[in-house]
Amino acid sequence: MDLAALRAKTPDHWKLATAIRVLAIDAVQAANSGHPGMPMGMADVATVLFRNHLKFDAKAPNWADRDRFVLSAGHGSMLLYALLHLTGYEQATLDEVKNFRQWGARMAGHPEYGHLEGVETTTGPLGQGISTAVGMAIAEKSMAARFGKKLVDHKIWVIAGDGCLMEGISQEAIGLAGKQELDNLIVLWDNNNITIDGRVTVSDVTDQKARFAASGWDVLSCDGHDAEDIDRALTAAKKAKRPVLVDCKTLIGFGSPNKADSYAVHGAPLGDAEIKLTREAYGWEHGPFVIPAEIKAEWEAIGAKGAAERAEWEARLAALPAGKRAEFERQMARGVAPKLAGAIRAFKKAQSEAAPKVATRKASEMVLAAVNPVVLRNHRRLADLTGSNLTKTSDIEDFMPGNHKGRYMRYGIREHAMAAAMNGMWLHGGVRPYGGTFFCFTDYARGAMRLSSLMGVPTVYVMTHDSIGLGEDGPTHQPVEHLTICRATPNTWTFRPADVIETAEAWELALSSERTPSVLALSRQNLPTLRTKHEAKNLTAKGAYVIAEAEGKRQAILMATGSEVEIALKARALLQAEAIGTRVVSMPCMELFAAQDEAYRKRILPAGGVRVAVEAAIRQPWDRWLLGERGMERKAGFVGMEGFGASAPAERLYAEFGITPEAIAAKVKSLL
């Protein structure tokens, strides 16, 4: 490629794009770690995007009506960091660029939400960014339908690489976006035909443009190193009536004389000798991290070009009726609905009196029917299991093309994209998402669920059919290890409520959470209401509490969750009949119990006596409460699952696997 000709054709563009490239090269070299090739290859596309098309104001990084820019190919993070520094984001200082990938750096190896203003989402696991962006596009459509396009009218731009498009989640996401006709979503494909193993063709033959077209997208193409051609394609993309893929044909490591267009430039520093040659090829005579003042000033002018449009938008917001303005600001700030606690208390009082025997998945549906009128931002999602998960209430319409006021989306069989899109909705602002599937299929959503926890996105995962209690569908659908996986994930609340009252309390906590996602593990089988005396206080908020005290001298403590609390209470009755004083502790959320002070934990789990945990799942997370917290190994036992389940009616399964009142009582007596 003739670099001199390109430089002569668009000299102003060339110097702006070269500033991105050299910052990326220098930062990776200084860190002795990183991915210079992608920023070098996509610098031209990014320059045209930020210079001519992206609606943003670097001095107001949280402006509600800004365009969102998602770097799905997160390994090329220095592309984003260079742009943020050059355009004048306050936190993106040159010192931060020099501190790339170091301890305490805002500029982490892959972009991390919350570390640096201008980073819209955490990316790095390939495919997550493009899928999260679909959720942002959905949230934009939802907010525009509620508040009007004078207040909400922006695009979601994504840079995705070959790896993003190979990941299975990308097909889930693009199929969903195509079905929903998300014309506010534009994906810029860094089509450089390189992976770590070499050419993309060594592992893939997919016609990506045909794939997107078949999924309901418009597809455009451009020369990713021709500024005028890039501008033409992006201008056309903004006018489309469907989501758009722009195929940007690029060279990875553009300008490197010996490493461009090869895997060698993907994930390693260029080295001093190659950097010298590359600078010469660019015509760049400045040293490491040096950006001439006139180029920095031009970039900062690009960063400020949205200020006037933002001021006009703020004037429109200020002109709204006070109530509507306050509601818009509250929703974008992700505030908790002020009437939520009252609605939950009223629901609990009514249900403790009625004492229904219902599955906790049904209890969840009942809670949602009670709180939906006061939590208007709830946007719910289902992976093709509406009738099983029970997350759609009668007052909710479907979100679809032509009805973006709808708050219920049918995802199809796309668990992973559902989870990622929910992350995007919350990150965009204005939507409090929850979505559901069978608990066993959290396996399909794990990557995005982990990012919820890492980013502090308080998504609610409604996971039903939580144990062998689902019965005849068998071990492919019966979760036994999934509670352990969720509990092992940092910054995750895993709720397994025992009845309708605990279900309501779990929902209150999940919808009030600011930075922690929640998993609600809910039963298929009916469970009795255990707490028939109304308690205004949210007992689940403590994570564990005494649901039945020992009569006489306490000799044993039974700990249980969910459907096994009822079984533990029946075991208590058997033991008390033999004068074995037994306390039953319901532990709907281990994480919240662990967060309580030692005095409270000691009151619930005092020293001495036998401890037996009961759960239709594997033992692993229980050892802290059985052996630690003043417990003793010789007096600790577990009644639950040691392997996978089987296909049979639920009652038979509980009997065959020994999760019965009689087995629990026998375990206690064997340890006395």
UniProtKB/Swiss-Prot annotation:
Assembly mode: Homodimer.
Q: What is the designated name of this protein?
A: Transketolase
Q: What is the lineage of its organism?
A: Bacteria, Pseudomonadati, Pseudomonadota, Alphaproteobacteria, Rhodobacterales
Species of origin: Rhodobacter capsulatus
Please give the CDD domains that the UniProt record associates with this protein. Answer: TPP_PYR_DXS_TK_like (cd07033), TPP_TK (cd02012)
What does the UniProt keyword field contain? Answer: Calcium, Magnesium, Metal-binding, Thiamine pyrophosphate, Transferase
Explain the purpose of this protein.
Catalyzes the transfer of a two-carbon ketol group from a ketose donor to an aldose acceptor, via a covalent intermediate with the cofactor thiamine pyrophosphate.
Q: Does the keyword Transferase apply?
A: yes
Query: Where does the record place the site Important for catalytic activity?
Result: 35, 266
Co-factor note (free text): Binds 1 Mg(2+) ion per subunit. Can also utilize other divalent metal cations, such as Ca(2+), Mn(2+) and Co(2+). Binds 1 thiamine pyrophosphate per subunit.
The record's GO CC annotations read:
cytosol
Give the residues the record marks as binding Mg(2+). Answer: 162, 192, 194
